[in-house]
Amino acid sequence: MADKNPVQDKLSISVDTKTKLIVFSDIHLGAKRTKASTNVDSELSKQINLLAKETQSIVVLNGDIFELWAGEQPTVQKALSAHKNFNKSLVEFSKNPKNKIIFVVGNHDGALGWDHDQQQYLIKTFEADICFAFELNIKTKKGNKSILFEHGHMLDPENAFEDPRDPHDKPFGQYLVQKALPMVIQSQGKLITGISHLAEPHQFAKFVASRVFYRELLSKSWLLIIPIVITLILRLVVGYDIYTAAGFSPTFTSRVLIYTEVAVFFTVIGFLVAIAFILFQLLSRAKTMPSSFGPDGHHNSLARQKAQDLINFDRNIGYITGHTHRAEIRKLQNGFYANSGCGVEMVESTSTYLKLPKTYIGRIHLHWLVIDIDKTEFHINHWQSIETIQNQTLLERLLTKRSKKSSPLEIQKQLSVEL
C-alpha cells in the first residue's frame, strides 16, 4: 500500500507571542552553483544560524526553493549537495524540537507535491513539514490572529496547477522553461544571454529588440563607413585629374571637389540616418506581450487584493507570498501584505540617453523577511542586497543612464501591526 501523501493542503500551526520567523522564497537552488546561489548559500545560512539561537523559531521556505524544472534530472538532493552551508544550517536548526521548518510548494519545485522520494528526503533530513499553504495562528489576548503564507503562483494562470498532486499536470510556464527557452537560447546564443532571468517575462519581445538594436545594428554600423571612405578617396583622386586636364585652376578644382564630396557624404549620411530612424521606430514599438504572461504583468497587485479580501472576510491580519521576485511590505486596512522576494539574478531594463530603446542589465538580488511577534505587536522587516553584474557591451554602457547599481545588505523597510 502506497504511503499517504504527506503534503498538506493547508498546514496550521499555533504559536504564542515571543516567536520569530524568517521567510524567503524563489532562490531556485540547482545542482550547479551560480553567483546568485553562492550568495544565498553564504548569507541565508548565517541568518538561519542566528535564528537558531532564539527560544522558538520558524523557517518558512515559501516556494521555488529548488529549481526542479530546469537542468538535467534535477532533484532536491543534488541542489542541497551543491549548497552545503545552507543544508547544514537547516539541519542544525532542526535539532531544537521547538523550531519548525516549513516548505511551501511553489511551481518550479512543484514536484514536492507528488514526488515521494523528494518529500521523504526533506522530512527525514530536516524533520520538515511540506504544504501548499501555511497558516500561522497567533494566540493573543484578543483571540487568535492568523497570517497566511502561499507561494503565489496560483494567482498566475500560466504557472498555476489544476491539481498540484498530479505529476502529469504541467502548466504553460513549465513548457516555456523546459522546451521553448532552451530552443531559443540554443539558436541565438550570446545575443540573448540572460533571457531566462528577465525580471519582466512579458517584456520578451522588447528584450530581444533591444539586444538586436545594440548588439547587431548599432555595433556593426561602423562598417558602413568603409565604402563611403573608399568612394571619397577615389572621387578626389580621379576627379582632381579630370578638372586639371580641363584647364581649371588647382584652387577652384579643390574647392569644387570638396563641396561635391561633402554633399555626397551628407546625402549618404542622411540615408543612413533615415534607415536607422525607421529601424529604431520598428524596434521601439516591439510590443510587450499580454500582461497575463509572467506574474500577470502587475507584480503583486493580485496578491495585495487577495490579502485585503482575507483581512476583510476572515480573521487574517496578513498574507505573504513570493513568486513574482518582487519583494514588498505594504500596510493595508487592518493588516498587511508582504512578498518575500527572491535570491536570483534578475535582468532588468534601464533607461537610456536620447530616448533610445532601453538596455538590459543583470543584478543579483537577495531578499528575505524577518518577523518578530511580541505580546502586543507583529513586526516585519524586509532585508535586501543587490549587486550589479556588468554584462553590458561598451555601447550599451555608454548609452545607459547612470542609476543606483548596487545596494549593500540592509533593512529596506519595516512595518508593525497591532495584535
Briefly describe each language-model feature range:
Residues 1-419:
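Extended recognition/assembly regions associated with phosphoester-bond processing machinery
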